[in-house]
Amino acid sequence: MSSDKDIQKRRFFRLTYPRTAQPSLRNDDGSSYKVLEVSEKGLVLELCSGEPFKVGDAVCGKILFHDNQSEYIEGLVYRLDSRGAVVTLNNNISFRNIMREQSYIRSNFPLFFRQKMVGKPTPENSSDDQ
């Protein structure tokens, strides 16, 4: 039997990026943000001090993935937390792009990928994401 801890409670798989592989989001207003996590229906954007996001703000722009593929997204800031701005999307990020990104991270950052998949914390400046 599985415990509640072992059961995936999210509807969509989340892909967390190592620091050196984070794609950028070019917002329609010209600003640019690092993408920390991505799923088909949401993402987490890195916030630097003084960033203008508030809960409910619209986010529209293009994500540029590692293979130079891009995808236009539209969504709203759902919440702000210690990681950054959590954005729920009105449109899906394609499953194909999610899988390509997962494959890239798995191939190029195997230790990072394994640590994230088994839920072990990754040190901020670990050598596995270089």
Please annotate each region the language model reported.
Residues 57, 64, 78-80, 92, ...:
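A generic membrane alpha-helix/interface feature
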Residues 31-32, 59, 71-74:
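Residue-level marker for the onset of beta-strands and adjacent loop->beta junctions
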Residues 24-52, 81-86:
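Short strand-loop-strand
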Residues 22, 49-55, 87-107:
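Short solvent-exposed strand/turn elements
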Residues 1-38, 103-130:
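N-terminal helix initiation/capping motif
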Residues 64-88:
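Mid-chain, well-packed structural core segment of small domains
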Residues 20-26, 56-70:
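Short conserved beta-strand and strand-loop elements enriched in small hydrophobics
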